């Protein structure tokens, strides 16, 4: 059961909880899409922070995944079969054709956490590898903060590793 007084944790996927660098190809969006086959997606590797999605959920925290990916059926298969994401965890993902910069996209999609009364007074913690995304999220509201991977790792280990 969700503890409504505790912070809300928002996790990015690529290079934060999942290593998908083998799919980058030449670095273009076209290359990324071409490499987004089931075979390649199933080669993605889980990063250390990925385990905390389930640990935090188990301890009653609201956990959200917010990715800039356009999710394919194989991405969903990976989340549920390899990452073992609980089915009730909200996954915010990009719609086909959405070309906004990642920081603007994520801020727009996560703004409800700062506006809706049930979330407004709770701390929101975004964990993302991208500095521009973290900075934009931190500016979303006074109860919005963002952690890079080293800080998130340190916090998760000190707060939840012993309990996990």
Stretches found by the model and what they are:
Residues 19, 93, 100-101, 105, ...:
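Short, solvent-exposed coil/turn linker segments
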Residues 100-113, 158-164:
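Short, surface-exposed amphipathic charged segments that create phosphate/polyanion-binding patches used
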Residues 62-66, 111, 117-120, 145-149:
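Generic alpha-helical hydrophobic packing signal
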Residues 121-164:
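Acidic, Mg2+-coordinating phosphoryl-transfer loop and its flanking beta/alpha structural elements
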Residues 7-8, 106-131, 137:
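Conserved Lys-Pro-Asp/Glu-containing loop-to-beta segment of HAD-superfamily phosphomonoesterases
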Residues 77-85, 112-115, 135-141:
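Short, aromatic/basic amphipathic alpha-helical patches
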């Amino acid at each position: 059961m969700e503890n409504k007084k505790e912070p809300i944790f928002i996790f990015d996927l690529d290079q934060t909880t999942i290593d998908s660098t083998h799919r980058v190809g030449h670095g273009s969006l076209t290359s990324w899409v071409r490499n987004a086959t089931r075979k390649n997606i199933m080669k993605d590797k889980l990063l250390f922070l990925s385990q905390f999605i389930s640990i935090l959920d188990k301890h009653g925290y609201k956990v959200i995944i917010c990715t800039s990916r356009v999710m394919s059926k194989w991405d969903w298969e990976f989340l549920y079969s390899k990452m073992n994401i609980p089915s009730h965890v909200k996954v915010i993902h990009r719609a086909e054709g959405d070309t906004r910069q990642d920081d603007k996209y994520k801020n727009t999609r996560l703004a409800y956490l700062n506006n809706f009364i049930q979330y407004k007074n709770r701390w929101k913690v975004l964990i993302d590898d991208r500095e521009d995304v973290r900075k934009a999220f931190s500016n979303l509201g006074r109860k919005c903060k963002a952690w890079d991977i080293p800080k998130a790792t340190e916090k998760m280990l000190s707060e939840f590793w012993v309990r996990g």
